[in-house]
Swiss-Prot record:
A Pfam family it matches: Toxin_cobra-type
Tissue-specific expression: Expressed by the venom gland.
InterPro entries according to UniProt: Snake_3FTx, Snake_toxin-like_sf, Toxin_cobra-type
Record's keyword terms, sorted: Acetylcholine receptor inhibiting toxin, Disulfide bond, Ion channel impairing toxin, Neurotoxin, Postsynaptic neurotoxin, Secreted, Toxin
CDD domains: TFP_snake_toxin
Any one GO MF annotation of this record: acetylcholine receptor inhibitor activity
GO CC term (a single one): extracellular region
Disulphide bond pairs: 3-22, 17-39, 41-50, 51-56
Organism: Dendroaspis jamesoni kaimosae
Protein name: Toxin S5C10
Entry keyword Cell membrane: no
Highest taxon in the source lineage: Eukaryota
Biological role stated in the UniProt entry: Binds to muscle nicotinic acetylcholine receptor (nAChR) and inhibit acetylcholine from binding to the receptor, thereby impairing neuromuscular transmission.
Main location: secreted
Amino acid sequence: RICYNHQSNTPATTKSCVENSCYKSIWADHRGTIIKRGCGCPRVKSKIKCCKSDNCNL
C-alpha cells in the first residue's frame, strides 16, 4: 500500500507500507488544527479515518 505520511502544512510525501491501510487523523489544540497521515489504522487515536487504497489519505 502507498500512503501519504506528512503532517498538516508540510509538503506531501508518500511511503510504501507493509500494512494494507492508510489513515488520516484530524484534531485541534492550542496550535490550531493538526492533520496527521500515515500507514496502518491505529485504533488508539480519536477522529481517525482509515482507507484501503493507494494514496487514499490525502
